[in-house]
Amino acid sequence: EVGPTVDIGTFSITLADPGQNRFLKAILKARVSASSVLEEVEGREPEIRDRVIDYLSSLTVKETQGAAAKSAIRGNLKKRINNILRTGELESIFLTEFVTQ
C-alpha cells in the first residue's frame, strides 16, 4: 500500500558557489509511512524547513546537476528529516520542481 504524500514546501535558495549569485528553486513533496507521520510533518514544518534550507544552501551548482546529484539530494534530505521524526518516517522525497540559475 502506498502511503500518503505531504508538501514539504517551496524553497528559493542562494547556492554556495563563491563569488557567484547562483540560485536554486525547489518544490519538495514526500511520501510518508503512515497518516500519523503526515500530522507530525505538518506540525514540525519550521524544523523541517530549517533543515532543508541548511542543506540546500550548502550545495554548489555542480552538486545539483545530473541524475546522480538529484538522487543524493533526495537521500540526504530524507535522512535529515527522518532524524527528527518520532512517529514514523519519510519513505520517499520527490523533487516536483528543481531549477538552478
Feature-to-residue mapping (PLM):
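Flexible, low-complexity charged segments
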Residues: E1-Q101
